[in-house]
Structures are given as structure tokens and as C-alpha cells.
Amino acid sequence: MGKKIVFTGGGTVGHVTLNLILIPKFIKDGWEVHYIGDKNGIEHEQINQSGLDITFHSIATGKLRRYFSWQNMLDVFKVGVGVLQSIAIIAKLRPQALFSKGGFVSVPPVVAARLLKVPVFVHESDLSMGLANKIAYKFATIMYTTFEQSKDLIKTKHIGAVTKVMDCKKSFENTDLTSIKEAFDPNLKTLLFIGGSAGAKVFNDFITQTPELEEKYNVINISGDSSLNRLKKNLYRVDYVTDLYQPLMNLADVVVTRGGSNTIFELVAMKKLHLIIPLGREASRGDQLENAAYFEEKGYALQLPESELNINTLEKQINLLISNSESYEKNMSQSSEIKSQDEFYQLLIDDMAKVTKG
């Protein structure tokens, strides 16, 4: 029987990125790779865009909430259906392991794998677990964590951050990049705004409503909204980038980002000056606020509350970052929190082998 592994995770790009780092390595080593997710979710879109040899299985999924809502009744039913669908899929595949990156879509496959005695490996990126991974922990064989967790969580293994930033930077030049450089003023600093798969609208609206921003800076806006796409003097707006991602990062003097740990650790790995504008508690469980406080305390970045975002506060924080750039870059270069992709892959393979033999 050939080696098989099932991946799951979705809802945001951050719940898919690590999977897409690991999957090519498994494929290269001869594994048959399957993915359980929602056909209407961003995970399906990302898998399709990857062009990798992955079999995608769609299941029903529902959002789990900490508060009362009548929608919970329907969503609990959907989760139950998702568990039954996942049991059928995993029982048929008989994989050696399941790897979960979290998000609500991951709960049914994790539960199903455990019921079928398939080893479950889970990854948690944030300082505090989301509800989906709190549930997943109960069914996990091992949970890998980016940050140190309570010693009471005996199944956790702290590994640090695994990012999509490679150890070497490839030189890259194409027509788009040349045009962008020609549109930019070499005498101005360049800001790159990136909001992730959630929360980009605040940045998009701020840039649209603050024309004076383009007088003070060259502005790159990875917006997630194709209707905003344009290139003009001192401004480049694009909905989504793949090959251009690293070159655009290289162009930026400062990156303005949300508070997701995946993106921030990429910036730390690149030693890129960054300003964090986290999602508040009214729009999230507060994990981005915790992340922002952590990275600021480490001396990697500055933060700015979304409610205080305007041209004056932004300019003040940007100036502080640039005037103290040596200190921030030194702190990032000395970080011991980044784990190489190959190191984590080998650790996962070794742990899977131990569990299988055990």
C-alpha cells in the first residue's frame, strides 16, 4: 500500500499556507496527498491555484461560536454531517496520518481521524488557541505550536514559526515589476499594505480616502479586490500576487500589516520593518491584539490601533520605525523563533514514523 496523508485546514489563507509548504515535500517523497475542506472555501481556491497533485474532498462545515446564536443549531448539524463525510473519506483512504492547520473546516476530519485511529497532527500559529484548535487538541496525537504553551498541554510541541520565506532570495524581474518601479518616485519611501484574507478592507478604504498618502510615499496595496487594480504615479494596487510577492516585499521600506502571526513571522524572517494594525476584539477573538503586543515587546515591530489610523499617526509610526531601523532589524535577525521548512518537515516525518511504529 502506498503512503497516504490527508491535510485539512481552511477559512483563511493562514489556515492553508503551512499545508502548501508541506505538501510539495510529501509529493516529492512519493506520498499520495488528499485534502479535506469546503469546496466553497478559500482552501479549495488555494489548492486549485497551487497546481499540485492533490485530491480534494469537500465536506459540509459550520462555524462554531462561543456565544448563543440560533445559527449554532444548524451549524452543529453541519459539523455532524461533516464528521460522517470525513469518516467515509478517511476509512476509504486509510492514510498513515492527518495533518490539520486549523479553522472550523478542520474539526470534522480531526474527529473522524481519531475515531478511525489515524494519527492526528495539528498546528497552532497563535499565542492563544482558537476554538477549532481547542477542540482539535483533545483529538490530537501531537500539536505543534509557534509559541510556548502551558506545560499542562502535554501534547504540544513548541517548534517556532515555519514561514513560506525561503532561505535565499531569487532575483526576479519582469515587465510588471519594471513598470511599477518606473511609476514610483525613487526619492520617496515605499509602503506595502497587506491585509491578509480578512481585514484588507480597512487598508483599502484608507488608501482610497487618503490621496495625500501618495504624495508622501510610494504605495503598494495588496487588496484582495480586483476592482481596485491599477498602476499610476506612486501607487500600485493589486488584488493577489504569487511570483511578485517577494519582489514587492523587497521594494518596500515598511510593511503595514494586520496581526496574523503567519504574515508577521514572514516579515521577521525577511527582517522587514513593519507596522501592525491588528483586528480588534469587535471583529475577532483578540488573537491579533495578543500577537501585536508580543511582536512589539520583542522589538520586532510597532503597532497602531485601527481606531487611531490616520495619515498623521501612520506617518509618526513609520518615521519611528525608519529612524530606529537598525535596532528593529538587529532584533529580527537575532530571532530564534524561525524554523526552516525542511527541519519541520523532517520532524513531522520522524514523529509520524514513531507513532506508526508505536
From Swiss-Prot:
Q: Which terms does the record give in the GO molecular function aspect?
A: undecaprenyldiphospho-muramoylpentapeptide beta-N-acetylglucosaminyltransferase activity
Q: Which reaction(s) are listed as its catalytic activity?
A: Mur2Ac(oyl-L-Ala-gamma-D-Glu-L-Lys-D-Ala-D-Ala)-di-trans,octa-cis-undecaprenyl diphosphate + UDP-N-acetyl-alpha-D-glucosamine = beta-D-GlcNAc-(1->4)-Mur2Ac(oyl-L-Ala-gamma-D-Glu-L-Lys-D-Ala-D-Ala)-di-trans,octa-cis-undecaprenyl diphosphate + UDP + H(+)
CDD domains membership: GT28_MurG
Q: How does it sit in the membrane?
A: Peripheral membrane protein
Q: Where does UDP-N-acetyl-alpha-D-glucosamine bind?
A: 197, 288
Q: Which InterPro entries match?
A: GlcNAc_MurG (IPR006009), Glyco_trans_28_C (IPR007235), GlycoTrans_28_N (IPR004276)
Q: What is its EC number?
A: 2.4.1.227
Q: Mostly located where?
A: membrane
Give the GO biological process terms: carbohydrate metabolic process; cell division; cell wall organization; lipid glycosylation; peptidoglycan biosynthetic process; regulation of cell shape
Q: Which domain of life is it from?
A: Bacteria
Q: Please state where this protein is localized.
A: Cell membrane
Pathway, according to UniProt? Cell wall biogenesis; peptidoglycan biosynthesis
What keywords are assigned to this protein? Cell cycle, Cell division, Cell membrane, Cell shape, Cell wall biogenesis/degradation, Glycosyltransferase, Membrane, Peptidoglycan synthesis, Transferase
Read off the Pfam families from this record: Glyco_tran_28_C, Glyco_transf_28
Q: What does this protein do?
A: Cell wall formation. Catalyzes the transfer of a GlcNAc subunit on undecaprenyl-pyrophosphoryl-MurNAc-pentapeptide (lipid intermediate I) to form undecaprenyl-pyrophosphoryl-MurNAc-(pentapeptide)GlcNAc (lipid intermediate II).
Q: What is this protein called?
A: UDP-N-acetylglucosamine--N-acetylmuramyl-(pentapeptide) pyrophosphoryl-undecaprenol N-acetylglucosamine transferase
Gene name of this polypeptide:
murG
